[in-house]
Amino acid sequence: VFANSTLLPANGLNFGWGSYSPGGIISGKVVFVLEYENGDHYKFFIEKYQAGYTFKYAKWNGTSWEATQTRTIANGTDDAFFNYFSFDSGAKVENLEPSKSAWDLMFTRYYTFFNGQMMYRMAGVLQSPNVSVAYVRPETQGTSTFSAPAAASYSKTISTIGHSWKPTIGAPHADAVYYIKEGSTYYRLYFTTNG
């Protein structure tokens, strides 16, 4: 499996890198080759997810793959939503994000499967699992009165805002508004410039 890669068909049991199986285990099915700006290449395979991630990786030395390393990172070992790992050190990286309760939105660059064709690096906004977001378009941005969207409009998907606030090139959409719900508190967000 580690030497073969395939894209899984889209359905409710596939997670992009693996398939859900009875018993709550996601088993890996896809091998990724990661290319870094410095020219390093790593082969990466998530073997399974069950209360944490078990994965394999190997570095390309210019002529062949080095010895395969296997690691397991358990969830819940620190106060963070994400697990971080360094191929350079071969270990989990601690304390790279604020505590779970200390953030709502992360403005960052991330990769998405753009237009169902390819992985594409985007600039956008990811949300904490502590909030839900509703996207309304068209809506007047600069207004002193508004009505919050219906409860069913809110999503916990991490990339609800994502890159949808702007076209691939140019200024943000002038008629897009996001409602962010945290508990019983609502925030209204819209973008006015890009860059």
Model-identified regions with their sequence ranges:
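Surface-exposed, beta-sheet-biased, low-hydrophobicity segments with strongly acidic/polar composition
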Residues: 1-195
